[in-house]
Amino acid sequence: MLIQAFRANGFEADTGEVLKDDIDLFSGKLRMAINQGYGLIVTTGGVGAEDKDHSVEAILRLDHSAAAPYIVKFKRGEGRHRKDGIRIGVGQVGSALLVALPGPNDEVSLCIETLVKGVRAGWSKDVLASMLAKLLRGRLLEKMGHHPAHHCQKHS
């Protein structure tokens, strides 16, 4: 779905491999893609609050000032939550833009139009991350049965 959307919008796009939940492997593969000259690297999945989720942390290893806004916050240590929330990540390493999105197809689909628009317009990583996070927060509230205009908390 992502590959087709990028190609339909004039981008050259390749499918990457499915990676194990290992932060060293993940950040190494991102670095390899950067070194191979990819200008936009989008990952899906691995943005949750469990120990196995490392996508955002891998981007932060490569870009210490990456934008990593929360979609939702949790109390760390409750249930499966080993982190304090679910975040997405948008980083910049040289000319490569790195984006970590959630894995569910409906959430990826929701982000495609904004992602393409932001890349084309040259939005900063902070603006792009903020716009994507806003969309995803709204979707989460919809899934929970809340109307976003009445219950949305701003996270930074």
Q: Where are the regions that the model predicts?
A:
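Non-catalytic beta/alpha edge segments that cap or flank active sites
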Residues: 1-156
